[in-house]
Amino acid sequence: CAFGCPFEGEVPVDAALRVVDAYAALDIDRLTLGDTTGMATPPTVSRLVQAIAKRFPQMRVALHFHNTRGIGLANVVVGLDLGVREFESSIGGLGGCPFAPGATGNVCTEDLVYLLEESGFETGIDLGALIAVAQRVEAIVGRTLPGQVMKAGPRLRKYSLEGAKRAVG
C-alpha cells in the first residue's frame, strides 16, 4: 500500500521511491500505486505522484483507489491533474481488503467513468450499459452496492413528469 498502512502508519515518500527505484532498475516503465487499505488522500497522492514524476519522468503511473473514507474520486481528480490517465476500479465498488480493518470497496467503475466523461475525457465506454451491469451485479450479490451513478443516473437524465407526480403522491 503506497499511501498508508493500518499497522505501520504513513508510508514515507522516500520508502515508496526505493521500491520504484528497484522497478526502474529492471527497466519497468509502468507501475500501479495501490491504495488497497483506503488511506490515500489528495495531498498524499499529490506528493507521491509528483515525486515519482520528478525522479522517473519515463515512468507511467496508474492509480488504484478504494473509497473507504469517501474520497476515492477526489484522489482520481488529483491524479488527473498530475497527468495520470490509468485508473483501476470495480463494478459497483466491489472489493475490500481482508487485512485492513474497516477498508471498503474500490472506486466504482460507473462513478469513475461518469467523472471522466463529465470532465471531458473520452472513455469509449457506454455508461448506460455499465450502469445496467452494476445494477445486475447488485441484484446478483444480494446487497446494496455503494455506486452513486448506478442509483442516480447521469445528471441530465430525464424523467417523465407523470412518473414524478406519481412518486410524490
Regions found by a protein language model. Name each.
Residues 1-169:
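Catalytic cores and adjacent flexible loops of soluble metabolic enzymes
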